[in-house]
């Protein structure tokens, strides 16, 4: 991937427009988790430290275009950002009619981009209006990189200079390191409730990895493909043949899809359900598999400890219930102990990492969500493609 980076730009005396992802959750009218705001600070501070004025734009929630309601207002986000920066951050509601006059060190925020007509349809005129505000456009919203919208793609086409922010560049560099030029052996963990939601990821990674670990309901479908009885466990019978193809593809290249030989089962899916460890051959018709067993966890942990690269998306058991958390904990700790470069993404994965206290030991934790998954699928991310295109158009590569 060839794109300009903010940290390569001379921004002194310039106005920088940063598309951030500050779509934070609220509880009781207050921001309940400011992780996304803090993740964007590096780019804002870089600009301020280097003599620029900054305009931040972000989406918040899912407002209807052309309508504005109190819950759509980014004012609380601007106030929180201002608190972190130690300066006032004003919200601009009429920025199209009144272009702001800014001095070096100023920070302002545009009102919620998703109330603007044409935002979701990637309207070029709206993109030009955004671009007219700045000398340099910075996309630092990796979480929206898989969407072609006016504040992520059209603006990049129209801006004098378009580059990746600190967070965006970090995400892309880490993903590139993990998937484009991985240290071997490369091991991926893909887990979740359904094969159907991760089928393209499984197929894409099967072309790249040396070992493909599956977990959760996905593993149950693969167990069915191996002819194993899984009781009343969640599985997709219509995707057994697809699972067989993926296993055959891995075997043909000398790899494998290592499936559990022992599992943790219960009669019901509940926080107080009794957990029983069983050999996979002994799962009864009225039981459901809710985690991998200790023998399987130990074997998979050995694979991870010996890996050169690990890509992790999804817990291998119902880790929210402690009695079914052993498998995910064992794998998380193995990744933490491994010398491999590791990258992890997805909401449940990040929650598991936090629960088991291995955040500092993971090589890179992606904030991307849907963008992370689409990158794993091998899809082009529109916002990233726009940055690459503008670099080529400007004759910079």
UniProtKB/Swiss-Prot annotation:
Coiled-coil boundaries: none
Annotated ATP binding sites: 198, 320, 346-349
Keywords: ATP-binding, Cytoplasm, Glycolysis, Kinase, Nucleotide-binding, Transferase
Stored SUPFAM superfamilies: Phosphoglycerate kinase
Oligomeric and partner information: Monomer.
Family as reported in the entry's similarity comment: Belongs to the phosphoglycerate kinase family.
Protein name (Swiss-Prot/TrEMBL): Phosphoglycerate kinase
Species: Neisseria gonorrhoeae (strain ATCC 700825 / FA 1090)
Gene designation: pgk
């Amino acid at each position: 991937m060839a794109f300009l980076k903010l940290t390569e730009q001379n921004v002194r005396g310039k106005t920088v427009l940063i598309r951030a992802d500050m779509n934070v959750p609220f509880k009781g009218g207050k921001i309940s988790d400011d992780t996304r705001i803090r993740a964007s600070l590096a780019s804002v501070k870089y600009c301020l430290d280097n003599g620029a004025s900054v305009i931040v734009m972000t989406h918040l929630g899912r407002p209807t275009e052309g309508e504005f309601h109190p819950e759509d207002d980014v004012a609380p986000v601007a106030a929180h950002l201002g608190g972190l920066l130690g300066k006032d951050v004003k919200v601009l509601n009429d920025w199209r009619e009144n272009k702001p006059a800014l001095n070096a060190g100023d920070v302002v925020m545009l009102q919620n981009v998703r109330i603007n007509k044409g935002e979701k349809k990637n309207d070029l005129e709206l993109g030009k209006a955004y671009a007219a505000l700045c000398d340099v456009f910075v996309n630092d919203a990796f979480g929206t990189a898989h969407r072609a919208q006016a504040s992520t793609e059209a603006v990049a086409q129209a801006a004098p200079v378009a580059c990746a922010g600190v967070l965006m560049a970090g995400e892309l560099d880490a993903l590139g390191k993990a998937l484009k030029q991985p240290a071997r052996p490369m091991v991926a963990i893909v887990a979740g409730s359904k094969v159907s939601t991760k089928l393209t990821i499984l197929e894409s990674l099967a072309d790249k990895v040396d070992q493909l670990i599956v977990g959760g309901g996905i593993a149950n479908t693969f167990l069915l493909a191996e002819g194993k009885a899984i009781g009343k466990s969640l599985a997709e019978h219509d995707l057994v043949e697809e699972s067989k193809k993926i296993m055959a593809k891995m075997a043909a290249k000398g790899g494998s899809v290592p499936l559990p030989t022992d599992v943790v089962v219960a009669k019901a899916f509940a926080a107080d359900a009794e957990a029983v460890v069983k050999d996979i051959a002994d799962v009864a018709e009225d039981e459901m598999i809710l985690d991998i067993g200790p023998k399987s966890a130990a074997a998979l942990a050995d694979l991870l400890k010996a890996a050169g690269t690990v890509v992790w998306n999804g817990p291998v058991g119902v880790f929210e219930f402690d009695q079914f958390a052993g498998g995910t904990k064992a794998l998380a700790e193995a990744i933490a102990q491994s010398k491999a470069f590791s990258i992890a993404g997805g909401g449940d994965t990040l929650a598991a990492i936090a629960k088991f206290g291995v955040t500092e030991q993971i090589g890179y934790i992606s904030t991307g969500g849907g963008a992370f998954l689409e990158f794993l699928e091998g899809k082009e991310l529109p916002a990233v493609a726009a940055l690459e295109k503008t670099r080529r158009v400007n004759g910079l590569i």
